[in-house]
A protein has these predicted regions:
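Conserved cytosolic headpiece of P-type ATPases
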Residues: 1-747, 752-755, 768, 812, ...
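Alpha-helical transmembrane segments of multi-pass integral membrane proteins
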Residues: 67-69, 762-777
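Short hydrophobic alpha-helical module
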Residues: 133, 381, 771-783, 817, ...
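Helix-coil boundary and interhelical linker segments in multi-pass alpha-helical membrane proteins
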Residues: 705-714, 780-807
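Generic alpha-helical transmembrane segments
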Residues: 725, 806-824
């Protein structure tokens, strides 16, 4: 290659002019939403909106009561409580997403200050990557990241890993037009920003920088907001609409019913009094608004937030860094996972899968001469090196296939560096596609300085150069062996050697190897092995009713073989289940729509093939998760319901994703699905618990409205039940661990209402029973002077004298303890187990204890604020014991169902 002095490069003035004209070499980051706007976005939740409306109504009524009716300031407790509930819920959601994004930014830091060798004003200098401009002459070599899109001026054995852009791990680059690859995604004489030099070196002229590069264009495309509504959001929208409609209907019924009652009851009275009617109508409207407020589950947003936040933190421990809170639950609704191959299904590390050296017993290098020749041949006839800074997990620098051979030596406790230093290379013949082999003549360190020719390349070509073979393996036997390797999508290399005598010529620059007495040493098969945990993880997803599709830049044969190894591809699959990128692009939208569910593999996929696949699956009603680690994956990651980037993926891919798989393993995706499904069930359990409370409370307000009595539960007591206690309940149910049994179920129907048939029955029946029990207890307390629950059976009912603070304490505690025991039933819902199955439920039990202690403290110390008075110990025992019947009936029902 020409020396760098042949190029003058740009002058300082030309650099500034180019930067002014074409911009800087930095990808413009997506415009960050201001913190205040991100916080306000949390108020777009439909349940939050209902709460805010209810809070405003409640505040107006409180103002009227305080200023118009001269009531105490305690009337403001209810609106304050509602607004506190809103702020707690939105604040927590904002905090946890902010924390996750901070962790993500640390993970996704991009270094634009990496030094790059350029030629400017005739000198070779190093400048930061961000200072590269269009027109710069850049020098690139093995291990370098390409800083910008450029055209090659010179190249020597240049191989580039373009997998981040095209999915192709090894692309040969050349300036010789005759050697251009007609099927290559990008011209063979172009190198692209974000790709990496795997072997060789070259000089190139920069054509585009920053946003104008191919990486920049894909990054910009990934910023288009293709967000879709998540399944959980859809369900909460439906729930909020249901609650709104029911509360409005009840409010209208109360107003109409009470107005009718007024006229019916007042028909015999003397005349019609507008002042009395206005006062009555105002109190009726206040009762109607109270129903609206009571009907809204104040604790639900908090429950959802806590459940999502808890799952976010726990999922991080299992290799899932969740950036967007909704993605936790959406993973549970996933019906299709579109995954790439390299690095997710496989280890992204070329490895010697099988060695076939006849002279090696058990294919282990020994102390014999053949072993020494094999080891030296691999070490010296190679362009790759190893980074041994981590001796346990060395990494390859250079060609991954050649690096796999050095790793094999390393695993056999042979140091390739010692072998290289012990020999002297005399002549080299680089690898060329037309020859399909490379060769080197060395003064051997293992044969006391004798000249030895080593040849490595395509086994069938290397074997044809040989006069004999170790072990007398025939050509037919070799071909049969190679066919078996090819069926397994493995790359193969053959090895040969010859000890040269005197001045015997072994290599000719034009004709290649000219030696006539080569001995074939053997063959190795190299592959990127499947991760050990992937087959089981894929089987788990398939058992869970989740379809898995492979989208890769590899050949159809390689993709199908990987599919076979992980249990995704079998003999029963036909051509309809596999397609190449160009074929997929040629299909019409109607043809893709018809075929997309049957597809298992898209091979030779291009950047937008995966995005089109995702969009079509979504049109068919599928909930789609997509994995990707390359810049080319960003549009699909952004489009999918859940985008899953890999921890060692590009910054562009991670920026477009919702979850980053920090350990790069497909099995982590299976765990995310399990968490998502369990999370949805936990939210269902809380809704079951919360709505039972609300149904009972609504019935109480309704009964009071038509019977002309006040609610037996004060505003502050209802705040404890609906806000504080429900928040603790949300924490308790959110802390329930994920259940592996959910992976045996099929994905839930995203259109199925979050309150299923069983929940509806339990809410209405349980809420109705609680109401009747409470109504009966209130009736007894109103019509008798209850001083101790031990005397309840001997009480005489009278005409009614109102409720004392002691009786209010009994009623309040009675209602709370009914909900307390019902939480056990809610926890057992969907488990098929007893409510006493407490495995991994320490947090649940602790929070229940906090609720019980809190109730005791409020009744004992709450005084006038809560309209309560301390209860004797025997009354506590009676209340706790009597209300526990809720749990025992639930246990009997579960036992009967079993």
């Amino acid at each position: 290659m020409s020396k760098s002095k042949h190029y003058n490069g740009l002058s300082a003035r030309e650099v500034e002019e180019s930067r002014a004209r074409h911009g800087v070499n930095v990808l413009t980051p997506p415009e960050k939403t201001p913190l205040w706007k991100r916080f306000l976005e949390k108020f777009e939740d439909p349940i939050i909106i209902i709460l805010l409306i209810a809070g405003v109504f409640s505040l107006l009524i409180s103002c009227y009561e305080f200023f118009g009716l001269d009531k105490e300031a305690t009337v403001f407790f209810e609106p304050i409580g509602i607004f506190v509930a809103v702020l707690l819920s939105t604040g927590l959601a904002f905090y946890f997403e902010l924390k996750a994004n901070q962790e993500f930014e640390i993970l996704n830091q991009v270094n634009d200050e990496e030094p790059v060798r350029v030629i400017r004003e005739g000198n070779t200098v190093e400048v930061p990557k961000c200072d590269i401009v269009v027109g710069d002459i850049v020098m690139i070599g093995t291990g370098d990241d390409i800083p910008a899109d450029a055209e090659l001026l010179e190249s020597v054995q240049l191989t580039v890993d373009e997998s981040t852009l095209t999915g192709e791990p090894l692309c040969a680059k050349t300036t010789v037009e005759a050697d251009f690859d007609a099927e290559a995604t990008f011209p063979s004489n172009h190198v692209l920003r974000g790709t990496k030099v795997m072997a060789g070196h070259g000089i190139c002229r920069v054509l585009a920088v920053g946003d104008a590069t191919e990486s920049g264009k894909v990054f910009e495309a990934a910023q288009i907001d293709d967000s879709v509504k998540t399944p959980l959001n859809e369900q909460l929208d439906r729930l909020s609409n249901l609650i709104t409609n029911i509360s409005y209907v009840l409010a209208v019924l109360i107003i109409v019913g009470r107005v009718v009652m007024y006229f019916v009851s007042g028909s015999e009275s003397v005349g019609f009094q507008w002042v009395d009617f206005a006062s009555y109508l105002l109190s009726t409207i206040m009762i109607a608004v109270t129903v609206i407020v009571v009907a809204v589950p104040e604790g639900l947003p908090m429950a959802v937030t806590l459940s999502l936040a808890y799952s976010m933190r726990r999922m991080f421990r299992t290799g899932n860094l969740v950036r967007k809170m909704h993605a936790c639950e959406t993973m549970g609704a996933t019906t299709v996972i579109c995954t790439d191959k390299t690095g997710t299904l496989t280890q992204n590390r070329m490895t010697v899968a099988e060695a076939a050296f006849p002279s090696l017993p058990d294919q282990q290098l020994g102390a014999n001469e053949e072993s020494e020749l094999i080891a030296e041949g691999i070490a010296v006839n190679s362009t790759a090196t190893l980074d041994l800074s981590d001796a346990v997990h060395p990494s390859v620098l250079g060609n991954p296939t050649e690096g796999a051979l050095l790793l094999w030596l390393h695993s056999q406790s042979r140091d390739y560096r010692t072998l290289r230093e012990g020999s002297k290379t005399l002549v080299e013949l680089p690898f060329a596609t037309e020859r399909k082999y490379m060769a080197a003549v060395v003064e051997s360190g293992v044969l006391d300085g004798r000249r030895v020719l080593y040849v490595k390349g395509a086994p069938e070509i290397v074997r044809s150069l040989c006069a004999k073979a170790v072990g007398d393996e025939s050509v037919e036997m070799l071909n049969e062996r190679l066919l078996g390797y090819q069926r397994q999508a493995m790359r193969t290399l053959g090895f040969a050697y010859q000890v040269l005598e005197g001045d015997e010529q072994a290599i000719d620059d034009e004709r290649g190897v000219v030696a006539k007495d080569l001995t074939y040493l053997g063959t190795v098969a190299i592959s990127d092995p499947v991760r050990p945990d992937v087959p089981e993880a894929v089987d788990e997803c398939l058992s869970a009713g989740i379809d898995v599709k492979i989208v890769t830049g590899d050949t159809s044969a390689t993709a199908a073989e990987i599919g076979r190894q992980i249990g995704l591809w079998g003999e029963h699959h036909d051509d309809r289940a596999i397609i190449t990128g160009p074929e997929f692009e040629a299909l019409s939208d109607e043809e893709v729509y018809d075929r997309v569910n049957d597809l298992k593999i898209i091979a030779r996929a291009r950047p937008l093939d995966k995005k089109r696949l995702v969009e079509t699956l979504q049109k068919r009603g599928q909930v789609v998760a997509v994995t990707g680690d390359g810049t080319n994956d960003a549009p699909a990651l952004k489009t999918a319901h859940v985008g899953l980037s890999m921890g060692d993926g590009t910054s562009v891919a991670k920026e477009a994703s919702d979850i980053t798989i920090t350990d790069n393993s497909f099995s982590s995706i299976g765990r995310a699905v399990m968490w998502g499904r369990s999370l949805y069930q936990n939210i269902q359990r809380f809704i079951l618990f919360q709505m039972t409370v609300n149904v009972a409370a609504c019935f109480i307000v309704l009964a009071g409205a038509f019977m002309g009595t006040d609610s037996p539960l004060t505003v502050t007591q209802m705040l404890w039940v609906n806000l504080i206690m429900d928040t603790f309940a949300a924490m308790a149910l959110a802390s329930l661990p994920p259940a592996e049994r959910v992976m045996h179920d099929k994905p839930r129907d995203r259109n199925a209402f979050i309150i299923d048939g069983g929940m509806k029955r339990m809410i209405l029946v349980t809420g109705g029973i609680f109401f009747l029990l409470l109504l009966g207890f209130v009736y007894v307390c109103e019509h008798a002077d209850v001083t101790s629950l031990t005397d309840l059976c001997d009480l005489q009912l009278g005409t009614g004298a109102g409720l004392s603070d002691l009786e209010k304490s009994y009623i309040f505690t009675f209602f709370v303890m009914l909900q307390f025991w019902n939480m056990f039933n809610a926890r057992a819902y969907l488990t098929g187990q007893s409510a006493f199955h407490f495995k991994q439920c320490k947090s649940f039990l602790f929070i229940l204890l906090v609720i019980l202690v809190g109730q005791i403290l409020i009744v004992t110390l709450g005084g006038q604020m809560f309209s309560v008075t301390p209860l004797p110990l025997q009354d506590w025992a009676i209340l706790i014991g009597c209300t526990s019947v809720v749990l025992w009936i639930g246990e009997l029902i579960r036992l009967f169902r079993k």
